[in-house]
Amino acid sequence: MEVALYDYELPKEAIAQTPVEPRDASRLMVLERRTGAVDHRIFRDLVHILHPGDLLVVNRTRVIPARLFGKKRDSDVTVEIVLLTPMGDDRWEVLVRPGRRLKPGVFVDLGEGRLAAEIVETTDFGGRVVRFHYSGDFDTLIDEIGQMPLPPYIETALPRQEAERYQTVYSQERGSAAAPTAGLHFTPQLLEDLKKRGIEITSVLLHVGLGTFRPVQVDRIEEHKMHSEFFQVDPEAARAIAKAKQEGRRVIAVGTTVARTLETAAGLHNGTVAAGSGWTDIFIYPGYTFQCIDGLITNFHLPRSTLLMLVSAFAGREQVLAAYREALEKGYRFFSFGDAMLII
């Protein structure tokens, strides 16, 4: 299947540069999979759109200030490092720039010398494995010297005092290099209103890394390889999902990361989501048969991206691209700080 089938024209002005305030004032396109019908709402209307008994599943991951800047030791070369995955023993898988100058054995001094990164090896995905050298607590140090890893299409840095705007209000466990952006639209009040209406909410964990945002650089979808990301389904979530499925209630994934987590877990246990953790490199594109989710809340995604392919697998490529065209005509805002879709 050609990657070009998932391309579309996107004017630069449609890319949201700042988030809407309040969070739940963003727009919400509702797409009905069976008929292709589209409705235009506000995100806080979700409380009136979902049914009592629906189960919302959110991703409780928390973004770390994973973007670090420094100098290649004994030179004036500026280096950017983005933390991806901890590997133990102070080693991390990272992205680096400029890559060609950072070979094994090279040191990079970060945070005015408070942290040193030793390049250990080059990875299959063009990143690096580094070993960090430092004093004190690593997480505290990263919080002090790191920056939020906003996507490159967001051209204005988020002030440190506004860093929470790139976190979901229910984020708990540190580990992501990007936000699970579908969840950015929820407020504490909206979550409370949903619960009062009889809509159940549970959480799983997927630490967002290269697998979620790595561009597709091949011509055929089948040739793209996903990067592994850590996921976890705890017993409470597994029980809630199993009960909903047994009772014929809808399971609605808040974001593609939740969809990939639940479909991974279901694939390991003959269609049943069981408690457990591990690494997933699941790549969902048209032709995939969903085993768990009945609905999906998601943002509007980049052309030719694996996220757009996942959404197309769930709702149909032509139907999704038609909805995207309508969204552009009606002035919806795209990507991480943009508006949302509910696909049911």
UniProtKB/Swiss-Prot annotation:
GO biological process: queuosine biosynthetic process; tRNA wobble guanine modification
Annotated keywords: Cytoplasm, Queuosine biosynthesis, S-adenosyl-L-methionine, Transferase
Annotated pathway: tRNA modification; tRNA-queuosine biosynthesis
Cited NCBIfam families: PRK00147.1 (NF001140), queA (TIGR00113)
EC nos: 2.4.99.17
Family: Belongs to the QueA family.
GO molecular function, one term: S-adenosylmethionine:tRNA ribosyltransferase-isomerase activity
Free-text function comment from the UniProt entry: Transfers and isomerizes the ribose moiety from AdoMet to the 7-aminomethyl group of 7-deazaguanine (preQ1-tRNA) to give epoxyqueuosine (oQ-tRNA).
Enzyme class per UniProt: transferase
A Pfam entry, by short name: Queuosine_synth
Catalytic activity line of the entry: 7-aminomethyl-7-carbaguanosine(34) in tRNA + S-adenosyl-L-methionine = epoxyqueuosine(34) in tRNA + adenine + L-methionine + 2 H(+)
The protein, known as: S-adenosylmethionine:tRNA ribosyltransferase-isomerase
Compartment(s) of residence: Cytoplasm
